[in-house]
Amino acid sequence: MGKKVLLTGFDPFGGETVNPSWEAVKRLNGEEAEGVSIAAEQIPTVFHHSAAVLKKAIEKHKPDVVICAGQAGGRAHITPERIAINIDDARIPDNEDREPIDEPIAADGPAAYWSALPIKLIVKELRKNGIPASVSNSAGTFVCNHLFYQLMHRIDRTSANIRGGFIHIPFLPEQTIDKPEPSLSLETIVEGLRIAAVISALHEKDIRETGGSIS
């Protein structure tokens, strides 16, 4: 039986009219590639509500792998995240105008969780296909990191036979018309997430080689 991957993307936030994570993952919904089936769901950019929506999506699709994607304006690469940390520290309000400062995500949780995705292998395969990619060592402290941490905390506490992680993606070109930020085309992002989904489903173990960045 083939593997199933659940991809999630966020709704727009911070004054943007689109969110590239949702624009990309919704184009992969229902696809099959190399025996891997892909489903996609949208997550609200809301601290207190995002994990509940993800929980329902996991219960609905019963995936083998969950990859949450999010927008990281200012980054030039597709960046699989290495670690989720147990803190909310918002620089801007979320989409329900909540702005938690220095608040733990889970009072009974560990300081951090490692990604369970083969992040170095994903980077290698993306680069092999001409897609700029690098490992990120910080998912920030906004809703992206919050969801990443909640995903891994849920997997840990329920002993679910699921592997999960998070991937940040750059702005789309239309988002950078009025700001000097890097971007990637939607087609490139879609292909990058397709590759990441297949690699994550077919490979549980990562490789050990350079794939990160200085910061």
UniProtKB/Swiss-Prot annotation:
EC assignment: 3.4.19.3
Q: Where is the active site?
A: 81, 144, 168
Give the CC-aspect GO terms.
cytosol
The cross-references to Pfam families, in alphabetical order and at most eight, read:
Peptidase_C15 (PF01470)
Q: What's this protein's family per the entry?
A: Belongs to the peptidase C15 family.
What's the subunit arrangement here? Homotetramer.
From the Swiss-Prot or TrEMBL record, give the protein name.
Pyrrolidone-carboxylate peptidase
Organism field: Bacillus licheniformis (strain ATCC 14580 / DSM 13 / JCM 2505 / CCUG 7422 / NBRC 12200 / NCIMB 9375 / NCTC 10341 / NRRL NRS-1264 / Gibson 46)
